[in-house]
Amino acid sequence: MKESTLFYPGDEATHSSNSALRHGRNEGRKALMLAIDPGVSQCIGEALDRCGLEPVLLSTVAELRSCIRKSGISVLVCEEVLLDGNYKEVLRVSRAAGGHIPVVVFSRLADWDQYMEAVRLGAFDCLRYPFRTGELRWVVNRALQERSAEYPREKER
């Protein structure tokens, strides 16, 4: 197994994986991912890396509050329930920070009503976990394309 690196704010930790999370294609664009399960983090990190993004792992809404204003944030992917909150709080923090960072929510229990609620509250999309990594990559790429089309003058934060 190869060693790969997940990036934590102000720190880094290594995780073993079959493929490296970073391939040098990210050009400084970051994706914040909020998850509490290490297996989920690994799966999402690899998918985001394949989208050309540098995955930055967070596990709490408090960590998000301190990181969201940093430059290069292109997209945010979050688990439905976190250690100190949930996706609704993540959406509020993202909206309050300004900018137009697309938020993709994933849930183990997602149903149609939850999907509609997440989108109504401002999520770009809500995926049921486990999902295929290709599905997540497609949603993230679509979110980035729509953000570029809607806000062409906005620099990535």
Task: Go through each PLM region and give its residues.
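Conserved phosphotransfer cores of two-component systems
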Residues: 69-71, 93-100, 121
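Non-catalytic signal-transmission and effector/linker regions of two-component phosphorelay proteins
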Residues: 1-47, 51, 141-157
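Acidic, metal-coordinating helix/loop segments flanking the phosphotransfer/catalytic sites
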Residues: 57-75, 82-85
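Conserved phosphotransfer microenvironments
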Residues: 41, 74-94
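C-terminal output helix
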Residues: 131-140
